[in-house]
Amino acid sequence: MAQLIETVKKQTEKLRIRGLYNPEKDARSLICAALNLDPVDYILCTNKNLCDSEMSKIDSFIDRRLKFEPVSKIIGKRYFWDLEIFVDSNVLDPRPESEILIEKVLENTSNKRSILDLGTGSGCLAIVLSSKLGQSEIDGIDISKEALKVARKNANKNNVQVNFFQSNWFSNIDKKYDIIVSNPPYISKSEFVKLPRGVKFFDPGIALYGGEDGLVSYRIIARSIVSYLNDEGLAFFEIGQGQTNAVLKIFENQGLSLVSVWKDLDQNNRIICVKKDA
């Protein structure tokens, strides 16, 4: 029988040889998930002898990682803000940049409490906002029925109330909101081919690809958004690197004005907020 500590070393080396970033962290995460161990259990069980069935599950997880599948998709979860979010191949992995969007919405809510999450995916934005804003009325829409199943599962898991329903952007929406949030597809054609394999092959393309210039979704949203925002309503969008001026122009052409732009940890413009004037 192999010991846990030796197994971690061997699996780490496999991942390192493959050229994966942070191989030891990945190996530990996957092995803990395979054995249902939390970090404390892991420390206490490093001399544990592993049976054949345990080794088989570990090998299965490591083999998937060697094919560049993200750890979160293998173990089926990722932490976002302070919540555990279930993820699978039908939804985009929640990313740290999107936590900035949450932060800025929370800073600017005041009495604005009806919120729409456009293209909700896993539901992470709507669910965190619901957990922080209590009695707010929050809707989340997506064109993908499979993504909506994931979003509802996450809402139930985190004990929050969000109304999720299918809509192609605004097609099935019949009311106005104080706040609209969205992390739309914004990867351009030239950027898409350069994406890491873990993103390009394991996140849904519909949640990534924003057309030739990456701006198609913003144009579609901008054409209708004024009709779905209350007066003085705010809209928060995640944007791609170098897209600030183009995205702002798209929304200004539809009668919205800039409130602010915020940077991510790499000092790239990442979140833009626009307003519907009264």
PLM-predicted stretches and their roles:
Residues 1-43, 47-50:
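Non-catalytic accessory regions of SAM-dependent methyltransferases
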Residues 186-216:
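Mobile active-site "lid"/loop adjacent to the S-adenosyl-L-methionine
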Residues 32-108:
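Conserved AdoMet
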Residues 212-275:
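Conserved Class I SAM-dependent methyltransferase catalytic core
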Residues 30, 68, 98, 125, ...:
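Residue-level signal for inorganic ion chemistry
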Residues 96-194, 198:
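Conserved SAM/SAH cofactor-binding pocket of Class I
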Residues 8, 27-28, 58-59, 68-71, ...:
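A general structural signal for well-ordered alpha-helical segments in protein cores
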Residues 84, 137, 161-163, 257-260:
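Conserved beta-strand segments of alpha/beta enzyme cores
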